[in-house]
């Protein structure tokens, strides 16, 4: 079984949120078997900055669903969307 790399767009619920703290909370929320392989930041609008972690997950049933759910439950997260997925 291989692995999948997914770039996930995480929108904070406020432009005033501390992105470093949010990044730490996202890392702590990862389900077993998943790991983050770097973060990017994307200026969206009006001071709002999205986090774009690249997450490595096993290539099995469910794919990135567990990660998306975990990220969605993190305090300060407005929305979560998979931007790009590829096998590695």
From Swiss-Prot:
UniProt-listed Pfam families: EF1_GNE (PF00736)
Keyword Protein biosynthesis set for record: yes
InterPro entries recorded: eEF-1beta-like_sf, EF1B_bsu/dsu_GNE, Transl_elong_EF1B/ribsomal_bS6, Transl_elong_EF1B_B_arc
Gene from which this protein is expressed: ef1b
KW Protein biosynthesis (keyword) present: yes
UniProt keyword annotations, A-Z: Elongation factor, Protein biosynthesis
Role played: Promotes the exchange of GDP for GTP in EF-1-alpha/GDP, thus allowing the regeneration of EF-1-alpha/GTP that could then be used to form the ternary complex EF-1-alpha/GTP/AAtRNA.
Family from the record: Belongs to the EF-1-beta/EF-1-delta family.
Lineage: Archaea, Methanobacteriati, Methanobacteriota, Stenosarchaea group, Halobacteria
Protein name in the entry: Elongation factor 1-beta
Molecular function, one GO term: translation elongation factor activity
Annotated CDD domains: EF1B
């Amino acid at each position: 079984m291989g692995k999948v790399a997914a770039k996930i767009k995480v929108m904070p619920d406020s432009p005033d949120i501390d992105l470093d703290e949010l990044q730490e909370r996202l890392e702590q929320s990862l389900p077993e078997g998943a790991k983050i392989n770097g973060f990017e930041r994307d200026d969206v609008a009006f001071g709002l900055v999205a986090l774009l972690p690249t997450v490595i997950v096993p290539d099995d049933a469910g794919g990135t669903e567990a990660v998306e759910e975990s990220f969605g439950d993190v305090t300060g997260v407005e929305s979560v969307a998979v931007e790009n997925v590829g096998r590695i």
